C-alpha cells in the first residue's frame, strides 16, 4: 500500500507573509512563498496521521481536502506547532467503526501523541480539550510516545522510530517512518552521527534562515547535515521570510528542495 507525506505548512512561527503583511525577501507573486506554519500529514489508506496542529491547520486541511484525522503526533510544545488543537473537534464527531458516536455523551476523542513534556504542557494549556468541560466532552486523549511505536491497523499501519533532539532549551521529537525523517525544529548538529538518520530516502529538516540562530538550523547547517547524512532527497522546512523560494532553488543541490505548502512526497 502506498504512503504519502504532504507538507501542509512549511513556514516559521510567523509565517509568510507575517500578519502585518511583511514578505521580507519573498516574492509575493510566487505562490510557493506563501507559507503557513509547520505541519504535515502522513496518508496510508484510511490512516491519516497529522504531524503537529499548527495555528493554520484548519486552512491547511481544507486546502488539501483532508476530511479525516486518525491521530496526531507532536514534535514539541511550542505554540506554532500546537495552537490549532481545538480545530480537531469535528473529528471527535466521526463514526467509530460502523457505529455513530453520541458526541454529547462521551465523544470519540482523537488520540494525540508526544513526549512527556509536550503532553504535560498541552494538558495544562488546553485542559478543556482533554477533559469534559461545562458539559462538553473531551476532544483529544493524550498519549506519551515510546521510542518505537505504531499507529493504524493491519496494512495501513505506520511504524515510527523516534529520537529526542535539541531545539534551543527544549527537546523536540524527530520522527522516522517509511525511510523518512521529519525534524522540523532543531539546532542539534550531533544528529549527523546518529544511526537512526542514516540511509534515508527523505529528510525533512529545519532551515530557518541564512543567518545563524540559537535554536534552529540555518541554511549552511541544514546543508551540512544533508552532506553528512546523504539522504536521497532533503526537503528544507520551517522557512522564514528571508528565504525566497527561487533564490533557494537556484542555489541548492539537485537533491535538496525548499518545501512549499502542499508539497507531496511519495514515500
Feature annotation, model-predicted:
Residues 190-267:
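Binuclear metal-ion centers of metallo-dependent hydrolases, dominated by the metallo-beta-lactamase
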Residues 1-183, 187, 192, 249-267:
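Binuclear metal-dependent hydrolase catalytic cores
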Amino acid at each position: 500500500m502506498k504512503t504519502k507525506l504532504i507538507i501542509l505548512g512549511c513556514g516559521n512561527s510567523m509565517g509568510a507573509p507575517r500578519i502585518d503583511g511583511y514578505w521580507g525577501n519573498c516574492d509575493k507573486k510566487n505562490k510557493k512563498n506563501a507559507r503557513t506554519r509547520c505541519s504535515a500529514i502522513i496518508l496510508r489508506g484510511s490512516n491519516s496521521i497529522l504531524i503537529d496542529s499548527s495555528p493554520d491547520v484548519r486552512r491547511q486541511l481544507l486546502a488539501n481536502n483532508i476530511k479525516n484525522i486518525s491521530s496526531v503526533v507532536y514534535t514539541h510544545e511550542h505554540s506554532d506547532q500546537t495552537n490549532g488543537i481545538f480545530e480537531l473537534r469535528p473529528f471527535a464527531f466521526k463514526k467509530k467503526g460502523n457505529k455513530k458516536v453520541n458526541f454529547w455523551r462521551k465523544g470519540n476523542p482523537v488520540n494525540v501523541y508526544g513526549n512527556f513534556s509536550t503532553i504535560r504542557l498541552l494538558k495544562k494549556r488546553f485542559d478543556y480539550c482533554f477533559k469534559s468541560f461545562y458539559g462538553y466532552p473531551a476532544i483529544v486523549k493524550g498519549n506519551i510516545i515510546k521510542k518505537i511505536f505504531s499507529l493504524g491497523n493491519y496494512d495501513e499501519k505506520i511504524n515510527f522510530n523516534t529520537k529526542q533532539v535539541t531545539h534551543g532549551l527544549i527537546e523536540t521529537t524527530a520522527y522516522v517512518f517509511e525511510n523518512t525523517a521529519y525534524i522540523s525544529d532543531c539546532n542539534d548538529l550531533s544528529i549527523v552521527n546518529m544511526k537512526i538518520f542514516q540511509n534515508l530516502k527523505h529528510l525533512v529538516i529545519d532551515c530557518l534562515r541564512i543567518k545563524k540562530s540559537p535554536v534552529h538550523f540555518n541554511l549552511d547547517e541544514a546543508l551540512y547535515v544533508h552532506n553528512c547524512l546523504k539522504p536521497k532527497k532533503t526537503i528544507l522546512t520551517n522557512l522564514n521570510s528571508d528565504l525566497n523560494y527561487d533564490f533557494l532553488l537556484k542555489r541548492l543541490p539537485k537533491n535538496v528542495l525548499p518545501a512549499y505548502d502542499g508539497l507531496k512526497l511519495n514515500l
